[in-house]
């Protein structure tokens, strides 16, 4: 997502969705290895679901600090205070650190594209959520000048372009159509 703050500063924010169910544990772990933080999306009426526990545990095991997003805040019966209490209890039961227990909260209606730091004072857009991401999440630490290195989290194949690697750049940079080598764990190059 390309986003510009109120001062005109532009940001590129990568948002990666992950399945919420334990049945997709491997996929969740792959996604967690590519991110610097997590947006934990929780319904303003229902609160944390059983699968929330699984995904949150994976985030904590990676040392990530969640940003809690209470969605559907405009829904009849929304109970944000109860939801936040439930999230705090969940985090505590999962052994969250003090830093993880001091989680930021954003309230939103994703369907209506509105967000805010207070459930009673939402902006007419999602800017408060993006601003919170920019303010809270540190940019990735990448050695831009070094030789290209990417941690591959998943491989795919396309008959037109060949092997497609999804992952996180750890060092250097890559340009469109640039040829690269894939080095396997055993050192073989392809």
PLM regions and their residue ranges:
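Short, well-ordered amphipathic alpha-helices
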Residues: 16, 84-92
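Oxyanion-binding/catalytic loops of NTP- or PPi-dependent enzymes
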Residues: 72, 85, 177
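Short hydrophobic alpha-helical segments of the AMP-binding
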Residues: 1, 31, 59, 91
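Short acidic, glycine-rich loop/turn motifs
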Residues: 1-7, 182-186
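Conserved Switch II/interswitch segment of TRAFAC-class P-loop GTPases
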Residues: 6-13, 18-25, 32-82, 143
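Amphipathic alpha-helical segments in well-structured domains
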Residues: 52, 80-87, 126, 130
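Conserved catalytic-core segments of large NTP-driven translation/proteostasis enzymes
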Residues: 91-190
